[in-house]
């Protein structure tokens, strides 16, 4: 098959897809990844580097945008070297990224004026509280589908403009640019030629109207962000320019962009309303495809754009859980309870039950469905017989309990029962957690062949745009489930466990402090 790239607004050329591949870039919270994917949706090669995160004050989370960019380019080079597949055999590039994380940079120099403020950062909680007290919550929710929370980008941009010397004046003069991580990467990978984001990332800023599909002037005014700072919004599967020749000699086109969780939804082939996936990464992120319907949640979830491709926008319900895999990192790095994350499954399974111990990992408050930025992490139910295994098991179980709360909220919002859950992310390889998840939900949990479904989704978006894959049906044929976890827990024990969890959450909420 060949494609005339001129039809995509690119230079006249034809591309023979024989022996070619798609490259996916996944710029996550803890690492950046470059993946080469073949026509069957299989991973041929990968390169990964960790991303350094700083915590300058309690509740503050930052990353160096230049270091993130350098690491992303480095893995692009490394995966070509490892695989022997170079830029002349890359048909297109897709990008997925940690969402909400905010970068502001100078339009002339291209240099960031401050570190990237990461999605987990809670520094803007006082400003958000003030907006809630002013009655702004309904405006934000009705326009964006989101709740007022420090999680989203709007208050982060506002903080940078208010706290960096000269930023307000530069913004007023049109000299500053704002972007989530995808925009920052696209701008730099194209040598400053393309300043754009996609609909999924835009929908996570709390500045984008998901009904009109445009930046919302009322919200820009509410957060005091000039419209001149905002990137162009494009389809998730479409043209984002070519990679600069000093980065990749043959300048492959960037043809797919999506926030990591939407890319994961696409990678799972959740193309139909009601299909649901959960990613167990730094946090847990559960998304349900709701088709062309924007479901207004009454149960603490957010409505967001699920994917925007082929001239059509599909929406999703989402529940964002702030602490999942990061809880395991906390046990290892902060408490030295485990020496490696892989040790957690064995320890958790070494005891027959949780011994009445519950762990609520509200290190950055609680996300869906509670949305309490002031909740505090707790471990409760300890006795003199409690051990290291007790705490590790409670931490593992916390991912499943939080996911249970989100899934039940989804079912209430849409008025139907979810029959199965597709899973990915690093913790989805923890057999203890996946079995406990199936037991709690009382439905099958489907484990994919690869944990890197986010990268697969980004590759699919790029490949569809250039005709590497024909249609969604071809992608569905690529989907491979390697294991299904079936529920075994009795209803009585399930309810006993959930009652203990609900009590633990109640104790962690700010209303109990």
Language-model region placement:
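Carbohydrate-associated surface elements
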Residues: 121
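Structured loop/turn residues at beta-strand edges in well-structured enzyme cores
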Residues: 85-88, 228, 416
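Short linear loop/turn motifs
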Residues: 230-239, 345-349
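Active-site core segments that coordinate phosphate-bearing ligands/cofactors
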Residues: 5-17, 23-25, 125, 131-195, ...
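Short beta-strand-loop/turn "lid" adjacent to the catalytic site in phosphate-handling enzymes
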Residues: 81-118, 147-153, 186-209, 234, ...
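N-terminal glycine/serine-rich phosphate-binding loop of ATP-dependent small-molecule kinases
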Residues: 1-114, 142, 248-256, 441-445, ...
């Amino acid at each position: 098959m060949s494609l005339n790239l001129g039809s995509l607004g690119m230079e006249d050329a034809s591309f023979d897809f024989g022996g070619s591949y798609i490259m996916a870039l996944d710029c996550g919270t803890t690492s950046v990844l470059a993946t080469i994917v073949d026509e069957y949706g299989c991973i041929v090669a990968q390169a990964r580097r960790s991303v350094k995160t700083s915590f300058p004050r309690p509740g503050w989370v930052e990353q160096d945008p230049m270091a993130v960019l350098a690491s992303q380019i480095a893995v692009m080079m490394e995966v070509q070297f490892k695989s022997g597949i170079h830029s002349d055999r890359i048909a297109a590039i897709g990008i997925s990224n940690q969402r909400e994380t905010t970068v502001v940079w100078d339009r002339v120099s291209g240099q960031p004026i401050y570190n990237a403020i990461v999605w987990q950062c809670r520094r803007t909680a006082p400003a958000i509280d003030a907006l809630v007290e002013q009655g702004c919550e309904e405006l934000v929710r009705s326009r964006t589908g989101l709740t007022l929370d420090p999680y989203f980008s709007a208050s982060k941009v506002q903080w940078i403009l208010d706290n960096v010397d000269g930023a307000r004046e530069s913004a007023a003069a049109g000299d500053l640019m704002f972007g989530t991580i995808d925009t920052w990467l696209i701008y730099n990978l194209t040598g400053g030629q393309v300043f754009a984001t996609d609909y999924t990332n835009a929908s996570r800023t709390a500045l984008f109207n998901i009904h009109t599909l445009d930046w919302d002037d009322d919200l820009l005014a509410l957060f005091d962000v000039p419209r001149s700072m905002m990137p162009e919004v494009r389809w998730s599967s479409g043209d984002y320019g070519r990679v600069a020749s000093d980065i990749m000699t043959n300048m492959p086109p960037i043809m797919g962009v999506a926030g990591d969780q939407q890319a994961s939804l696409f990678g799972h082939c959740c193309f139909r309303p009601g299909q649901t996936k959960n990613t167990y990464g730094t946090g847990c992120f559960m998304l349900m495809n709701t088709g062309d319907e924007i479901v207004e949640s009454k149960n603490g979830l957010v409505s967001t754009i699920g994917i925007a491709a082929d001239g059509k926008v599909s929406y999703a319900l989402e529940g964002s859980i702030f602490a999942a895999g990061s809880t395991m990192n906390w046990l290892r790095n902060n408490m030295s309870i485990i020496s490696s994350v892989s040790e957690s499954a064995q320890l958790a399974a070494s005891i027959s039950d949780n011994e009445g111990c519950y762990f609520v990992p509200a290190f950055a408050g609680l996300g869906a469905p509670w949305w309490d930025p002031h909740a505090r992490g707790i471990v409760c139910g300890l006795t003199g017989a409690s051990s290291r295994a007790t705490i590790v098991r409670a931490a593992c179980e916390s991912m499943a309990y939080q996911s249970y709360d989100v899934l039940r909220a989804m079912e209430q919002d849409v008025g139907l029962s979810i029959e199965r859950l597709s899973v990915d992310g690093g913790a989805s390889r923890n057999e203890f957690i996946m079995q406990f998840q199936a037991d709690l939900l009382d439905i099958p949990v489907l484990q994919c062949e690869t944990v890197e479904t986010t990268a697969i989704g980004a590759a699919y978006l790029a490949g569809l745009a250039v005709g590497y894959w024909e249609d969604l049906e071809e992608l569905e044929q690529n989907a491979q489930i390697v294991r299904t976890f079936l529920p075994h827990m009795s209803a009585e024990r399930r309810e006993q466990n959930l009652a203990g969890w609900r009590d633990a959450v109640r104790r962690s909420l700010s209303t109990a402090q």
